[in-house]
Amino acid sequence: MPIFVVEYAYTPETSSGRDDHRTDHRAWLRELERRKILRSSSPLADHSGTTMIVEGADKLSVERLFAHDPFALAHLIERVHVEEWVAGT
């Protein structure tokens, strides 16, 4: 299955909203881990975004999946970028 990098960009204005929805966001990510979709995720050191490594059938299916993140549903993500990642090349 292809591997994708999913990058979120946040704005400082959404910080409190992200705090409010963080528990649901993390539960959603844990479910992706349980389903073996999410391989790795970590926020950026400056808290301006997050990078995640995921498996998916194609770019569109990954974009559709991440549209259901509680952060996305609450409009707390400034930008989502999904790109296929070819490891080891």
Describe the function of each predicted region.
Residues 1-89:
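Conserved, structured core segments of small domains
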